Amino acid sequence: MLVMENTIRVNKRISNSIRLKVTSRCELHCNFCHKEGSTSIEDLCWDRNLREAILAFKQSMNIDEIHFTGGEPTESKYLGELTQALISNGFKVKTTTNGLCEKERLIALYSNGLRYLNFSIHTLDPVGLQRIQKRMNIADALKIVDIQKKNILLIKKLGAAVKINTVVSSIDDIESACTVYNFTKDHGISIRFLNNLSKGIKSVNAIKILVQKLHAQKTREEVTIGSSSKTAFYTDRDHYEFGVKEIQDFKLQTVCATCAIDCKEHFYGMRLEKRNGELFVRLCLAKEDKKTFINLKAFFLSEQFKELKELTTLN
C-alpha cells in the first residue's frame, strides 16, 4: 500500500516473516550485540517438529519469509539443509551474516538456494573494528576486514541480493560507518544504518549527523504493519540510495500494555528458537517471561497469537 506524506512516499506492508535463531555461536564479540535475546539455545535442524511449526505459521499467519539469525547463522552445520527444505516448502529465505565463513562454505550455501544475505558490517577500518570488539589484535582485524570484503563481492558476483547493515552507536562511529558507506557505494550494494538500541537518543542523533555529512535527502519510507520496523530511505548528491532503520511506536498489547520496562525496540517481530529440545516463540528481547517466551504449542492457543494473527491477516 503506497501513500504520500508531505511528498515523502510511504510504502506500508503487512509483516510476513519470522526469524529463526539457528545457533547462538559467533566468533565475533561486538560490544552492542543483543544476541537476539538469548544464548542458551540449541542449533535448529530440519525435522518434523520444525517443519510442522513453520507450516503452521504459514497457514495461520501468512508467513512466507524466513530470516536466519543467531549468533552467526553460517556457524550452523544445518544451514544448507534448512535453506533447501524451506525453499522447497515455498518460503523466501534470507540470512544475516558477519561474512566470515570460508568462501567454499558461502558458495555451497548459494548452491543450496540462499539468495538473500544481509551482512552485518560495522566498519571496514581495522582500528575501528578493534574498538567494537572485546578483544582483538590489529593483525586479526586486518584479516577479518579483508575476508568480509572478499566474501561480499563473491556472493554478489554469484548473483545473490546483498545488503549491508551498519550499527552507529555514537558520533565516534561516524567515520567507521563512512568506510562501509564508501565501499557499498563504490560497488553498487545497498546499505542500511541501524541505531544501537541500548544507546537510545545518542545513537539516533549520531545517525542524523551522519546523514547530514553525506548530504542526503529523505525520499521514501517503508513501514511494516504489525511491527515496529520502519526504514527511511535517503539519496545523496550522486543519487545513491541508502536506508536508515527507525523504530516506530508499535507495541503488542498482549505483551507490552502492562510492561514497566522502557523498551527501545517495542514489538519488532517473532523469533523462533529451540531450548531443551522444545521450540519456543520469543516476542521480546528485553525480558523473558510467560508472555514473551512461549512454548510453540501454547503459543498457537495464546492471546498473543490471536492479536498477531489479526494484524498479519489484514486485507
Protein language model annotation of sequence segments:
Residues 1-3:
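Short, Lys/Arg-enriched N-terminal segments with co-localized hydrophobic residues
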Residues 6-49, 61, 283:
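Canonical Radical SAM [4Fe-4S] cluster-binding loop centered on the CxxxCxxC motif
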Residues 32, 36-39, 207-214, 262-265, ...:
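Secreted/processed peptides and extracellular or luminal domains of membrane proteins
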Residues 51-68, 76-175, 182, 192:
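Radical SAM/AdoMet-radical enzyme domain recognition
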Residues 75, 102, 170-173, 199-200, ...:
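Alpha-helix N-cap/loop-to-helix initiation residues
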Residues 127, 136-254:
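Radical SAM enzyme [4Fe-4S]-AdoMet core and its adjacent flexible, acidic
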Residues 251-315:
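Flexible mid-to-C-terminal extensions adjoining Fe-S/redox cofactors in radical SAM and related proteins
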